[in-house]
Regions:
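Intrinsically disordered, low-complexity regulatory regions
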Residues: 1-15, 23, 28-42, 266, ...
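Elongated alpha-helical scaffolds that mediate protein-protein interactions in large eukaryotic proteins
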Residues: 2-59, 63, 67, 71-73, ...
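Alpha-helical scaffold repeats of the Armadillo/HEAT/TPR superfamily
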Residues: 8-12, 49-59, 92-101, 134-161, ...
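Acidic, Ser/Thr- and Gly/Pro-rich intrinsically disordered linkers and low-complexity segments
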Residues: 14-16, 153-179, 261-293, 336, ...
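Short inter-helical turns and helix N-cap capping residues of alpha-solenoid HEAT/ARM repeat scaffolds
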Residues: 23-24, 66-68, 108-109, 178, ...
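Alpha-solenoid helical repeat scaffolds
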Residues: 30, 59, 73, 91, ...
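Hydrophobic residues within the alpha-helices of tandem HEAT/HEAT-like
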Residues: 34-40, 74-83, 104, 116-128, ...
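Non-catalytic interaction/regulatory modules that flank or connect domains
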Residues: 184, 192-248, 253-259, 263, ...
Length: 462
C-alpha cells in the first residue's frame, strides 16, 4: 500500500525537483540523477506526482532538451513515471513532450534514440497519447495530420531498415540482449493500432503495399521486442472484421501465424494439401515460437479471423488445424491452450446464428484502459504492447500481450505494450462443412477433449 509522504519528505522532494531549474548545470545533473533512483520505486512515484507546489513531470519535460547527461536522466525518469502512472502520461502530453521528443529523434546527432522510443511507447499507451502522436488533437488540420504521418512513417522506416545487433545475455533472465535503438517503434505501432485512425494508418496503401505488410517480416526478428509489438498490432487489426479479407487474402496472416506456431512434428501428406509449403519446408528443424506473448497473439489472430464465415473457410483451406493441433499437444501455457480449444471448436463445427455487432465489439474492446505490464524477460508489446529506465543499464522493454498497453520501466526492464482489445463474443453464422471433413476433425478432436456441440459458445480473446 502506498504511504503518504510526511511534511519533511514533501519539502525535501520539492527542493530536489526545484534544482532541475537551477542555473548551475552540475546541480541540475545531481537532481536528475537522484530522480532516476526515486522513480524506480512505485511509492516514490506516487509521492512525487502528488507534490502540491511543483509538478515533477513539468520540471523533467523542461530539461529533456538540456545537455545530454541531464537530458538522458530526465528521459529515464520520465520513462519510469509514465510506466507507473497514467497521470504522468497525461501531464507529459500537457507539456508538449511528444513534440519535443519527435523533434529530437529527427536530429542525426541525437544519441538517445532508444530511450526516446521507449518514452514514446509509454506515453502512447493511453488513447490520448496515441491520438496526439497521430496528430488527432483539438487543433488538428489536414496539414498537421500529414506532417505527423510523415514523421511516424520516418520512424517506421528507420525501424524497418535497422537490424538488431547481439549485445550479450541478460544475467538475470538468461535472455539475449540486443543493441536495437528503434525496437520500441514496434510498441508504438501496437499502441496506435488501438485507435481506428491508427489502424487506418497501418493499412493505408503506399507504393502497392501497406505499412502492416512491410512489418510482417518482423515476426521473424531475433529480437522478441519487435516480434511482440508487431504481433500485438496484427491482433488489433484483426478486431475489425472489415479488415479480414485483406489480412487473410492479401497479407496471408493465417500462414504467418502458422509459421509462429508450427514445430518439428511431421505432417501427413493429406495435412499438407492446401497448406503453404513454407510452413512445413524446414521439416524437423522447424522451431516453434518460444515467447508466450507472441504465441498467444498468434492464436488470438487466428481466432478473430474465425469470427467471419469466409475467414473460417480460409483457415480450413490453408490447413490451420493440423498446426494448432500439434501446437496444443506441447503447449505448456493454460491460457493459450484454452484459446486453441476455442479456435478448434470454430473450425470443426456447424454453426448457427448471426454475425456479431462489430461496432459494439470495438466499443467494448477499446474503451477500457487495460494496461498490462510485460514480463520481465524480453520487455516491451504486450504484445501491442511503458518503460522505466534503469540507472546503469540500458532498459530492456517487455512486450505487450495482445491486449493491453505497453509500459516499460528501465530499471525493472518493464515495458507496456498496448494489448489489443478484449476479444469479442461471437455468434457464428450458418455454414455447411463437408461430412468427410467434419468426421476427420471429430476423430482428432477426441484426443484434444474439445466439446464441439455447443451452439452458443462465446469467443473470448483475452
Amino acid at each position: 500500500m502506498t504511504e503518504q509522504a510526511t511534511a519533511a519528505q514533501i519539502k525535501s522532494m520539492e527542493e530536489l525537483v526545484s534544482f532541475l531549474s537551477h542555473p548551475r548545470p552540475e546541480l541540475r545533473k545531481s537532481a536528475s540523477s537522484l530522480l532516476i533512483s526515486m522513480t524506480a520505486s512505485d511509492q516514490s512515484v506516487f509521492q512525487l506526482l502528488a507534490l502540491p507546489k511543483l509538478d515533477v513531470v513539468q520540471a523533467l519535460c523542461r530539461v529533456v532538451s538540456d545537455m545530454r547527461p541531464i537530458a538522458e536522466d530526465a528521459i529515464k525518469a520520465l520513462i519510469n513515471l509514465t510506466a507507473a502512472n497514467p497521470t504522468a502520461c497525461e501531464r507529459a502530453l500537457k507539456y508538449d513532450l511528444l513534440n519535443r521528443v519527435m523533434t529530437q529523434v529527427e536530429d542525426s546527432e541525437w544519441r538517445l534514440t532508444d530511450y526516446s522510443m521507449m518514452l514514446l511507447a509509454n506515453v502512447t499507451t493511453t488513447p490520448e497519447g496515441a491520438k496526439e502522436l497521430l496528430g488527432y488533437d483539438a487543433k488538428a488540420t489536414d496539414a498537421t495530420l500529414a506532417l505527423r504521418e510523415k514523421k511516424i512513417r520516418t520512424l517506421t522506416n528507420a525501424f524497418l531498415e535497422s537490424e538488431p545487433e547481439p549485445e550479450g545475455v541478460d544475467a538475470a533472465t538468461g535472455d539475449a540482449k540486443w543493441d536495437d535503438e528503434y525496437q520500441y517503434v514496434a510498441n508504438i505501432l501496437a499502441n496506435i493500432s488501438q485507435l481506428e485512425q491508427g489502424r487506418a494508418f497501418l493499412l493505408k496503401m503506399r507504393q502497392n503495399t501497406s505499412l502492416v505488410g512491410a512489418l510482417m517480416p518482423q515476426l521473424k526478428s531475433p529480437n522478441v521486442v519487435r516480434r511482440r509489438g508487431v504481433a500485438a498490432a496484427l491482433k488489433n487489426l484483426c478486431f475489425d472484421s472489415d479488415n479480414h479479407f485483406y489480412l487473410y487474402d492479401q497479407l496471408d496472416v493465417p500462414t504467418n501465424m502458422m509459421l509462429l506456431l508450427a514445430g518439428p512434428e511431421p505432417l501427413d501428406e493429406e495435412d499438407k494439401l492446401g497448406m503453404n509449403p513454407v510452413v512445413f519446408s524446414q521439416g524437423d528443424k522447424k522451431k516453434r515460437e518460444q515467447d508466450r506473448q507472441v504465441r498467444l497473439a498468434a492464436v488470438d489472430c487466428l481466432l478473430l479471423l474465425c469470427t467471419t464465415r469466409n475467414g473460417r473457410k480460409d483457415l480450413r483451406r490453408k490447413k490451420v488445424y493440423p498446426i494448432i493441433r500439434n501446437a496444443h499437444l506441447v503447449e505448456p501455457d493454460e491460457e493459450i491452450g484454452d484459446q486453441i480449444y476455442k479456435l478448434v471448436d470454430f473450425l470443426i463445427r456447424d454453426e448457427e446464428g448471426e454475425e456479431p455487432d462489430w461496432n459494439d465489439i470495438r466499443a467494448k474492446s477499446f474503451a477500457s484502459d487495460q494496461e498490462t505490464k510485460t514480463g520481465e524477460d524480453g520487455e516491451v508489446v504486450k504484445p501491442p504492447p511503458q518503460s522505466k529506465a534503469p540507472e546503469p543499464k540500458k532498459p530492456e522493454p517487455k512486450a505487450p500481450e495482445a491486449k493491453k498497453q505497453v509500459e516499460t520501466r528501465v530499471e525493472d526492464k518493464k515495458v507496456k505494450v498496448p494489448a489489443s482489445s478484449t476479444s469479442p463474443a461471437v455468434v457464428a453464422e450458418d455454414e455447411n462443412v463437408s461430412d468427410d471433413f467434419a468426421g476427420q476433425m471429430a476423430n482428432e478432436m477426441s484426443a484434444l477433449d474439445v466439446s464441439s456441440d455447443e451452439e452458443d459458445d462465446d469467443v473470448d480473446v483475452d
